[in-house]
C-alpha cells in the first residue's frame, strides 16, 4: 500500500472489498480475542463491523485513526434516528478525513472516497476515539475517548438522553 494518503486509501479500499452491508446474526469477529484479518472471501457486516476492521487495519499500519459513533438523522426523518451509526476519521500530516464506508456501500458508491454519509441529513457525534488534549492549570490532560452523554437525575439515577435533546445540543 505504501505510506501517506495512498496507503490510507488502499486500506479503505481493502476494507470495502471485504464486506457487504448487512446486519448478520454473528459478527465476523465474534469469539476472537483480536480483530481477524479477512484474507479471502467477503463478510456481511454493519457499520460497526466494517469500521472495527478498518480502524484495526489503519492502526496496525501505523496510521492515526478514530472510531466515531453518533446518530444520523436522514433528511426525510429529521425528528428521529432509529439506530446509531459509526464511521472512521484519519489524521495524516494534520489533515483529518472522514470515511463512511458502510453508507458508501449502501449507496452503491465505489470507490469509497473521504466523505461523510452521501445521503442528505444531519449527524450528531457522541463519541470520538482519536484522542484529545486539553490544557489545564495543572498541565495537559489527554483523553483517548470522549463518550456518549448520559443524563444524571437528582438522586443519582442515570438514563439515556432523548434523541431530540441530543439533536438540540
What does each model-found stretch correspond to?
Residues 42-45, 76:
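Alpha-helix capping and helix-loop boundary segments enriched in small/acidic/polar residues
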Residues 1-14, 96, 130-169:
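N-terminal accessory/pre-domain segments preceding catalytic cores
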Residues 4-8, 46, 50-54:
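Hydrophobic (often cysteine-bearing) scaffold residues that line and stabilize catalytic clefts
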Residues 11-13, 29, 91, 126, ...:
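Alpha-helical protein-protein interaction elements
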Residues 49-140:
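Hydrophobic/aromatic-rich core segments of domains that either
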Residues 1-42, 165, 169:
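Secondary-structure boundary elements
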Amino acid at each position: 500500500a505504501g505510506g501517506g494518503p495512498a496507503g490510507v486509501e488502499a486500506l479503505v479500499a481493502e476494507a470495502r472489498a471485504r464486506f457487504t452491508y448487512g446486519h448478520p446474526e454473528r459478527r465476523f469477529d465474534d469469539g476472537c480475542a483480536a480483530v481477524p484479518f479477512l484474507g479471502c472471501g467477503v463478510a456481511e457486516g454493519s457499520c460497526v463491523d466494517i469500521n472495527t476492521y478498518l480502524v484495526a487495519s489503519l492502526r496496525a499500519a501505523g496510521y492515526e485513526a478514530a472510531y466515531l459513533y453518533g446518530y444520523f438523522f436522514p433528511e426525510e426523518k429529521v425528528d428521529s434516528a432509529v439506530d446509531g451509526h459509526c464511521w472512521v476519521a484519519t489524521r495524516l500530516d494534520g489533515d483529518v478525513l472522514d470515511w463512511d464506508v458502510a453508507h458508501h456501500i449502501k449507496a452503491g458508491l465505489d470507490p469509497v472516497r473521504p466523505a461523510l454519509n452521501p445521503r442528505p441529513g444531519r449527524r450528531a457525534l457522541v463519541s470520538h476515539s482519536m484522542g484529545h488534549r486539553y490544557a489545564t492549570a495543572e498541565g495537559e490532560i489527554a483523553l483517548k475517548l470522549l463518550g456518549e452523554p448520559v443524563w444524571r437525575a437528582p438522586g443519582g439515577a442515570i438514563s439515556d438522553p432523548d434523541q431530540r435533546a441530543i439533536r438540540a445540543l
